[in-house]
Amino acid sequence: MSIANDNPNARPVVVLGPTACGKTRLAVALARAFAGEVVSADSRQVFRGMDIGTGKDLQDYGDTPYHLIDIVDPGAPFSLFDYLGAMQRTLDDLDAREKRPIIAGGSGLYLDAILRGYRLVEAPVDPLLRERLKHHDQERLNALLASLRPLHNTTDTQDRERTLRAIEIAYAELNEDSPSVQISIDPVVIGLHCDNDRLRARIRERLETRLDEGLIEEVESLRAEGLSWRQLDELGLEYRYVALYLQEQLNRNDMMQKLASAIYLFARQQVKWFRRMERQGVAIHWLEADDAPLDNALALLRR
């Protein structure tokens, strides 16, 4: 993006942090301050009809434009490759209109792919390849994967379907004609920090608010639109536990307690991912979520 290189004072901004720490509110305020637009880096906010459970907080945007929210129907396939392609198109559009991107989210994989420039290739399922490999046992599949991609993930060798998928991707990477995508930006990265006790309280408060706003009704609506219990479970967190409640496998109090605990554990995993990104070279400027984050972010960006 030219704005990342030609004008250092207009570098893209990334706002990251664990769930419930105020990322959306800060991103919107920064977009208003710097004639920018917000771009979501949340793996669930891409889905339509999942507003409350994913914390889209659309009321916080007002007239501030936002992107990569409500772009896919629930249950439709949407890969990291698809997301990065949509991100690149959005960044190109903002660059053409001289709008500053304010990327905000908590999905570690999406953020890592953006900030560390993952190069991904399009790798559709290959029926012919799978037909050739259908009689290979796991050991033989593992050997083939190792020959194609010596640095593969160990989890790719523990399940036949994962191994086949990894082999398909490896062959696609070797094909120079395979469509590829790689984000290349030089952003200022702001992280919102919240101590554990305060984070627990924020999560609990937000969960109670979401239930009051109609979280259970939202899950009922998704179910009525055709999503299976399995699909709701795969959406995780709010959708998983509310689905269990609707199936009478949990009472309301147990659902609340288990869901709050699950969200907190998820938030801790997010923090671990961000710290690992730092160890791998991503510079994150951490601000306290409860200590005037907007003022401190503005001071940082106006240096």
UniProtKB/Swiss-Prot annotation:
UniProt-annotated binding residues for ATP: 17-24
GO biological process: tRNA modification
Residues noted as binding substrate in the record, renumbered to the chain: 19-24
Cofactor(s) it depends on: Mg(2+)
Keyword Thylakoid among UniProt keywords: no
Keyword Transport attached: no
One Gene Ontology molecular-function label: tRNA dimethylallyltransferase activity
Described function: Catalyzes the transfer of a dimethylallyl group onto the adenine at position 37 in tRNAs that read codons beginning with uridine, leading to the formation of N6-(dimethylallyl)adenosine (i(6)A).
Protein name per the record: tRNA dimethylallyltransferase 1
Organism from which the protein derives: Hahella chejuensis (strain KCTC 2396)
